[in-house]
Amino acid sequence: ALDNENNNKFLKLNNEKIKAMKFDILKELQLPKDDLINYMNKLKDYIYVDEMNDLKIGGFIRWIPLKDPDEIYLTNGAILSEINVTDNGVLLNCKNFAKKHYQIKLDECLVFQKLSDQEKVLLFALDALSK
């Protein structure tokens, strides 16, 4: 897992830091306490992604659209199939299990990517080393 260059970002993280990062981001939305807890539970195996370089094609993502502040919700998610950099920003092309295609703008959503099994093992080991 450490030989994979894509995992280098995890060397500075552990499960507690990832959880705190998600909590801080969600707290900024000023959600009711029950919604905040619900989202934290639903995003248990996910990491917040704000950099295009941290996204993985083929990875499963969930997002919270920020366009309408009165309607904040967590999507069911989709598989990231393509990343396009345009004059309008970074566009993420996704496909869900019903084969429906989505295109979302990275800067108009909070994006969370599901951790792979390899990443989970690496984080577990880093947690153990930090104790």
Residue ranges and their predicted role:
Residues 57-60, 77, 89-90:
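Short, surface-exposed beta-edge/turn micro-motifs
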Residues 68-88:
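Short beta-strand-centered aromatic/proline hotspots
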Residues 81-101:
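Basic/aromatic-rich interaction segments and small domains that mediate binding to polyanionic partners
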Residues 1-28:
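Extended boundary segments
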Residues 21-57:
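Mixed-charge, Lys/Arg-rich low-complexity intrinsically disordered regions
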Residues 52-70:
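Short coil-to-beta transition motif at edge beta-strands of beta-rich domains
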Residues 1-7, 97-131:
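Intrinsically disordered, low-complexity, charged/polar segments
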